[in-house]
């Protein structure tokens, strides 16, 4: 699947992300890594390159820090919006902890809780929240539903730092647990709850318990279907971003092992913030740091010899704004050549 470049007579993996751009069957691309390693810059740059070869690209940030707006210098929200200067690249920032009530409501904006005053409070919400991760799972499912209906050719996820990155793989199970709990409640108290809710004007959007269950079931189906796609290497790949330091390398190895255990394809690593001091440079710190980075780079190349390892330099300025991102993105496909 990945193209190769011949160097000194040996077959080595090409040190670029060209294989991802060339793989036209890809629909989902995840970009993940430890905090502060340049994930957002990498995902924005990859999306810019994809926009050159694909009809429509959507870049989604699921990181609560939401750095896409800062990177492009343009405000994004929970609705997909075209990135200034592009006709086929859109971006959106979603809150992975969106309210479950918002998700279950069918657009009804009534602020009154129909169960308030009955001593039940936010019973449905409390019930759902009692299952760890259900809120995030439903939020993610809702986004996937929206994304599917928008029919973008390829979707790039700028994910939250490593700990949260792979949570989406557990979401179908989480939603099944929530459904089982709500189904049990419905079979025991359904008629009574529906009559109480009916008297109080129903749930938001005029739904009853059964409709609420159907809504959750459809979200679960969506997320299960997409999860199947996530495990198909023709449709999904994961780009790991790191820096040449021990902790980042350790996190990357842990993440790759976890991705492999879930059956998710990963064959590309972007190593950011590399120093290339000029020969004879008198900068002690630069030379010492470069020596350390070389050691970890060698380990990365040894561990991941069948990966596309992309080496990106540490730049003197922040990579912010369309022009700088475009310049940076070129180095993902044309390897950086350090000045002598």
Curated annotation (Swiss-Prot):
**Name of the protein:** ATPase get3
Got any disulfides in this one, which pairs?
Answer: none
The coding gene here is get3
Q: Which organism is it from?
A: Aspergillus fumigatus (strain ATCC MYA-4609 / CBS 101355 / FGSC A1100 / Af293)
Under Enzyme Commission nomenclature, its number is 3.6.-.-
Question: Is Manganese one of the keywords?
Answer: no
Q: Which InterPro entries match?
A: Anion-transp_ATPase-like_dom, ATPase_ArsA/GET3, ATPase_ArsA/GET3_euk, P-loop_NTPase
Cellular localization per UniProt: Cytoplasm; Endoplasmic reticulum
MF terms in GO? ATP binding; ATP hydrolysis activity; guanyl-nucleotide exchange factor activity; identical protein binding; metal ion binding; protein folding chaperone; unfolded protein binding
Q: Where does ATP bind?
A: 34-41, 245, 272, 320
